[in-house]
Amino acid sequence: MTDLKLRFLLNSQEIFSKLAKNFICEKTKYYLRLKNNALSLSNNDKNAICNALLQSKFTFRLANLPCVILLYDFCDLAILEVLFNDADELKNFKLPSVIDNLVLENITNNDSYALNNVALFGNPRFKFNYQNALKYAQNLANFSLQSPGLISAYDGIRCVLISLIKPLKATLNKFLAHKNTKSINELNFILMQNIAIMQSFGAIFDEKILNVFLSFLNNYTTNLNELAKKNYLCEYLQVQNIGVQSFAILERERSVLEDDCIAKSHELENILKEWVFVLHDDEFFYSSPLGKNELKSTLAPLFSRKINMFLTQIYSLNYESIGIKANELFVLASLFGSLYQSQKFAKFAKKLNNISINSNQIVKYKILNKAFNGAQMDDFKKQLSQNIAQSVKKLDKKNQKLYKKVDEIKEILKIYEEKGF
């Protein structure tokens, strides 16, 4: 048996009275739910990201072909599937009038009625239950947004943002406990994820509301970045047992920055409480008019714009900015690439991550080079200069490979933008 099939949306109020008179059906029931974007028949799966739906399956034969009618307990949705052995059977098939009169729509190629979408979002003609989705999004370790076109941009973006709250709080606590370079970098990354989403797709939120949170996060992250640089330099000098005249000044600057970041961390905890309140909005009160539009087509032009901004940044040779922008685009490709059902986004994200790593390495070398400016360490500074040159050359090769992927990604986004699915 091949996967050749036709699928039809039926008038469920009449279909079973007709079937009872004309066909002999075998009925089975099972629970349908989505686990890690794969269908599961379990009713009590802890990792499931939606409520279980009771699906009734009626099997029978029509013109000697196997047929299935799927009925769900949440609404009057009924789907007829007719299965074929080969293309000739499909081409010559014609529904008998008793069923043809009950067909509302041919949904063979309509992904909104695919089983995984039905399992996650219920009736494709639904009012999306955002509060229910939040319960799953905020507790999942790895939230992947694979959704049908019918979910709004406002709901989709907030699902991703709410899933980042728990890891953000955890990394914030880790920073306050350790205050070392590793914990600073981890906190920086999770903050950057939030900022990248809010800046890139901020047009779906009320501008004034969003700016309150975005302004604080940007200021906090700027200070945290400076602290990361000072911490890295101080730790490097201590490990390498290198003494420079300005070390005492450097350590004092680092200490002042650390105290400031700790104070602002407590403010961040309060800001996050308010942000969670906004993300739980169930009435589109904090949404812009754009937020009510469909998710995929709304995000596509915003995604493309972010790519163009990154490409412009590459030519600036400001390696710190290149690293930040590559990281931001990596976040977007990782979190939202699955929306567009193409493996190219994962490969694109991998290349962006490589560019970010190389750019950050150049920045570290430059931090050391600046710190030892004027010091009598000619051999060390010569080695640093060589490391910088090698890293720049390596980064240029990474950029060239990325350009080949950019056009492919933009073509995919263009399709969604133009057709509006």
Regions found by a protein language model. Give the residues of each.
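Phosphate-end processing signature that detects enzymes handling 5′-triphosphorylated RNA
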Residues: 1-421
